[in-house]
């Protein structure tokens, strides 16, 4: 492997990073490769099936499932940004990544994480309108509003990532830095910079606070109102039916927010311990795998649509209804 070092303004600037990943014996590397490859392929398959089921079943042409299809699409790319490079590193002695490759991976990772935070908040708002204002739900959650909200999620994610990258990509990294992680993330990159990264840290902290705190407040406020509404329902069966419509989303929210908040609680110090890599695996690999399963287990409409989709794909083309509100 050839290392290219450039001298710019009295700084030694590297063009490559070393991802330390999960240093273990070769036999365990092969085992990890097999496990993570199976997890990656299964995640892609699950989310693709959900997208196909929502697209092909007219009964799922509702705002709730429109946002769910965006979540599935997002998570397919979310894992694709990280998993392929991680899988290659399990089998290769060369665990380096180019500067441009690292910045590209970081940009899309931040984009998808920020987009998911906002999307989960919008899905919580959708459940709030459906349960607390059921009569006005079709009037409020129109196709136009849903499209605008979904587009806004992606726009905010892209812009947040772009602003962060402007500051992080300008930092100098000396020699060939070793990143104590299995992918390029913000905190480990800030830790290996050979110049003062306080400005980039402050921008990252402020934007992270905005992207995490505001959606979290929306989620908490939405579910507080939902809970208050459910408790006022007189019958136990009615309460159970109302809660079942948002149980899947609430489970996904708790999983994603708890993992990411735990990981990024102390960004400057979090990579001092390898245990944080395990937590990162949970929200970058395991949570995207579990999300489709959670929605299938707790949502009878999704389960029925998936059965129909699998049956149709296996037995040949079937007629599908047109999209409706």
UniProtKB/Swiss-Prot annotation:
Protein name according to UniProt: Olfactory receptor 6Y1
GO molecular function annotation: G protein-coupled receptor activity; olfactory receptor activity
Transmembrane segments annotated in the record for this chain: 31-51, 60-80, 105-125, 145-165, 203-222, 243-263, 277-297
InterPro entries in the record: GPCR_Rhodpsn, GPCR_Rhodpsn_7TM, Olfact_rcpt
Extracellular side: 1-30, 81-104, 166-202, 264-276
A Pfam family assignment: 7tm_4
All ranges on the Cytoplasmic side of the membrane: 52-59, 126-144, 223-242, 298-325
Topology within the bilayer: Multi-pass membrane protein
S-S bridge residues: 102-194
GO process annotations (BP): detection of chemical stimulus involved in sensory perception of smell
Family: Belongs to the G-protein coupled receptor 1 family.
Species of the source: Homo sapiens (Human)
Subcellular location: Cell membrane
Major subcellular site: membrane
Function: Odorant receptor.
UniProt keyword Cell inner membrane present: no
Sites where a glycan is attached: 10, 191
Keyword tags: Cell membrane, Disulfide bond, G-protein coupled receptor, Glycoprotein, Membrane, Olfaction, Receptor, Sensory transduction, Transducer, Transmembrane, Transmembrane helix
Example of a GO cellular component annotation carried by this entry: plasma membrane
């Amino acid at each position: 492997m050839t290392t290219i070092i450039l001298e710019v303004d009295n700084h030694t600037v590297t063009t490559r990073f070393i991802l330390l990943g999960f240093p273990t014996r070769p036999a365990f590397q092969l085992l990890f490769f097999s496990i993570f490859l199976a997890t990656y392929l299964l995640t892609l398959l699950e989310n693709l099936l959900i997208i196909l089921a929502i697209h092909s079943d007219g009964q799922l042409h509702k705002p709730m499932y429109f946002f769910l299809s965006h979540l599935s699409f997002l998570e397919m790319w979310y894992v694709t940004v990280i998993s392929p490079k991680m899988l290659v590193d399990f089998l290769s002695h060369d665990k380096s990544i180019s500067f441009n490759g690292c910045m590209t991976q970081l940009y899309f990772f931040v984009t998808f994480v920020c987009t998911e935070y906002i999307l989960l908040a919008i899905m919580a708002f959708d459940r709030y309108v459906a349960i607390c204002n059921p009569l006005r739900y079709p009037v409020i959650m129109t196709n136009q509003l849903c499209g605008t909200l979904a587009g806004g999620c992606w726009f905010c994610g892209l812009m947040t990532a772009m602003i962060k990258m402007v500051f992080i990509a300008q930092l100098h990294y000396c020699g060939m830095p070793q990143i104590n992680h299995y992918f390029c993330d913000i905190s480990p990159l800030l830790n290996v910079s050979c110049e003062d990264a306080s400005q980039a840290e402050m921008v990252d902290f402020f934007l992270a606070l905005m992207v995490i705190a505001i959606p979290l407040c929306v989620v908490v406020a939405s579910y507080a109102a939902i809970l208050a509404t459910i408790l006022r329902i007189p019958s136990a069966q009615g309460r159970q039916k109302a809660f079942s419509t948002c149980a899947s989303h609430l489970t996904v929210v708790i999983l994603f927010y708890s993992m990411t908040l735990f990981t990024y609680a102390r960004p400057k110090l979090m990579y001092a311990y390898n245990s944080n890599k395990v937590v990162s695996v949970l929200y970058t690999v395991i949570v995207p795998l579990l999300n489709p399963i959670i929605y299938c287990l707790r949502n009878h409409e999704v389960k029925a649509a998936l059965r129909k989709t699998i049956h149709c794909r296996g037995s040949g083309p079937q007629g599908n209804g047109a999209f409706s509100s």
